[in-house]
Amino acid sequence: MTPVRRRKLFILLFALSVLSAAAALVLYALRQNISLFYTPTQIVAGEAPAKHHIRVGGMVEANSIVRAKKGLAVQFKITDFENTIVVTYSGILPDLFREGQGIVAEGEVTDNHHFHATQVLAKHDANYMPPQVKSALADKVKQ
């Protein structure tokens, strides 16, 4: 192998290793910020990872909203019409949050039937439903 070819091969291998390292770092950083979506049925089945930031979506069950006498703590149940989980949240709820409303909550699973939310998102107009919730609920209705 000539010195010129050897140098070109070395430069190519070095550039490839630098690009691979950069891609690995980007993928690692993205993995830390991923917030996966689960339904109440998947959480009850134990498919959602514990101590990992996730999203859960469904409909707020009727007569399930319990507000604390003092403070902003609230507890409610969400359902996908197959299973129900209890969500606890401490903070200001969206103005459009109510029973029978489609919501997405972000937070962590505490056990198979309880979810601690750090953020609650409600629909913003009469025709909107989060795409993940809509498809998950449509799948449950078809079954």
From Swiss-Prot:
Gene Ontology molecular function: heme binding; metal ion binding
UniProt topological domain (Cytoplasmic) ranges: 1-8
Amino acids binding heme: H124, Y128
Subcellular location, record wording: Cell inner membrane
Superkingdom to which the source organism belongs: Bacteria
TM spans (from-to): 9-29
UniProt cross-references to InterPro entries, sorted A to Z: CcmE (IPR004329), CcmE-like_sf (IPR036127), NA-bd_OB-fold (IPR012340)
Gene Ontology CC annotations of this record: plasma membrane
Keywords: Cell inner membrane, Cell membrane, Cytochrome c-type biogenesis, Heme, Iron, Membrane, Metal-binding, Signal-anchor, Transmembrane, Transmembrane helix
GO BP term, pick one: cytochrome complex assembly
Listed Pfam families: CcmE
Disulfide pairings: none
Membrane topology qualifier: Single-pass type II membrane protein
Ranges per topology, Periplasmic: 30-143
NCBIfam families: PRK13254.1-1, PRK13254.1-3, PRK13254.1-5
Similarity comment: family membership: Belongs to the CcmE/CycJ family.
PANTHER family linked: CYTOCHROME C-TYPE BIOGENESIS PROTEIN CCME HOMOLOG, MITOCHONDRIAL
Purpose: Heme chaperone required for the biogenesis of c-type cytochromes. Transiently binds heme delivered by CcmC and transfers the heme to apo-cytochromes in a process facilitated by CcmF and CcmH.
Descriptive protein name: Cytochrome c-type biogenesis protein CcmE
Organism: Legionella pneumophila (strain Lens)
